[in-house]
Amino acid sequence: RLDEGSPFVDARLPDGTRFHAVLAPLARPGTLVSLRVPRTRTFTVAELVASGTLSAGTARVLEAVVARRLAFLVSGGTGSGKTTLLAALLSLVAPEERVVVVEDASELRPDHPHVVALEGRPPNIEGAGAVDVRTLVRQALRMRPDRLVVGEVRGAEVVDLLAALNTGHEGGCGTLHANSALDVPARIEAYTLSLHDALPI
């Protein structure tokens, strides 16, 4: 629905393109439409090295992190390539492992034969029926994932992800908005506190 009563909308087109629109007068000088077209394929780690995005040494370290089933977060600013790097790293996961990806809006497309994807859902026009990432993380844990992936950690789901990583779910990963690696703990703390704010007193 896109009209005066609901002047903005997020949707996904049949080819996977994400569509966002805001009507005037909220948008100036007029109605704005944004399209986010998904990549048709995933870059490999080797291609990221060849393009100069990663050094060979960094690639070896990241490959070892994946092979040893260590938990990790890819952090960076908006448009810095977090999803691109995470998809490339997930493509290194052994083909017999089950990768369960949880996202608010589907973006990750790792080149892996055993990927299960769960995607959040906004509320309908009556305000009902929403399914958030936190709920989907809990559902994913019931699917016996070899790798639990949260495409973008940006809320209270960080609590469930960290709990899973500390109770035997090795190799879990995700992305997180942060200006530097040093900022990551503070971001995680802020997301955890957002859960506290939502609790009834």
Regions found by a protein language model. Name each.
Residues 79:
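Walker A (P-loop) phosphate-binding loop of P-loop NTPases
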